[in-house]
């Protein structure tokens, strides 16, 4: 197939790209001269971004809008931050942050999606495959992996087990979840908003919490386990026979 783009159009596009690259490099050099450590030309920084001296910006990082990065932060690699504040000493690794405020000495990522109006206090950890939105986290919270927290207010030093979900939307309206200080949210807990978990309360793994959990209480909402003796035996015999046949075929 013939290339329908004229030489003039290609030259104009090349000039535009070269100009954009030159402007981007000027911004990088200005930040480096101001004491920011930038280790790769793959970094993109918008003109209105403010970065304190001593921050480290790693390869593949994109800083957009009116983002502010504090001293001693390590941003990247492969991180996108837009219209957000990241306070001093925080790390944001391979994650995306939009219109939010990350507090000091936070550890964000990898693969964390911090959506609009997320606010974190000192020492918060949002780990792998965690998504937050319109939520406030007091100091010292740990949300390590595979969790969604939306429209929530979380007290200090809470721990969220893997698979926690705040069920904040009923198809029409959004509702808030309130979690007190020093709470322990067990793995695969569903918190059906509006709901409150009191200070120092626990939720048992696998629970769907639809009512408030009082302070210092254990909220548990799941069926009791029943074991049916011998139920698996005929299934297991057929399964083992199938695998033994496969082994013989593979050994030929």
Which residue stretches match the model-derived regions?
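General secondary-structure edge motif
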Residues: 30-31, 36-38, 53-54, 71, ...
